């Protein structure tokens, strides 16, 4: 599975990239044919829940999408 992790309005550290890669990589345990996943991590400084995690997972015949707003980026990834 190919995982693409990008950031908007924040500096992506190796720690956050590795954490997201590890968590999204676990999808392979549940879905055999996941082809790729796009993870977009955003920081919105003027919002109460300022971190946004947007994940899109592609599998043959299906597209799964989730978006979470949270005060903590790691919690949002979970």
Curated annotation (Swiss-Prot):
Q: Which domain of life is it from?
A: Bacteria
Residues that span the membrane, as ranges: none
Matching entries from InterPro entries are given as: HPF/YfiA_ribosome-assoc, RHF-like, RHF/RaiA
GO BP annotation list: negative regulation of translational elongation
Pfam families found in the cross-reference section: Ribosomal_S30AE (PF02482)
Q: Which key words tag this protein in UniProt?
A: Translation regulation
Indicate whether rRNA-binding appears among the record's keywords: no
A molecular function GO annotation: ribosomal small subunit binding
Q: Which family does it belong to?
A: Belongs to the HPF/YfiA ribosome-associated protein family. Long HPF subfamily.
The name on file for this protein is Ribosome hibernation promoting factor
Q: Which organism is it from?
A: Acidithiobacillus ferridurans
């Amino acid at each position: 599975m190919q995982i693409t992790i990008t950031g908007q309005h924040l500096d992506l550290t190796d720690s956050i990239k590795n954490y997201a890669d590890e968590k999204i990589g676990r999808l392979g345990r549940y879905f055999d044919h996941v082809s790729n996943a796009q993870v977009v991590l955003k920081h919105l400084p003027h919002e109460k829940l300022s971190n946004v995690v947007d994940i899109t997972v592609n599998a043959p015949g299906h597209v799964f999408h989730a978006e979470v707003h949270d005060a903590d980026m790691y919690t949002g990834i979970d």
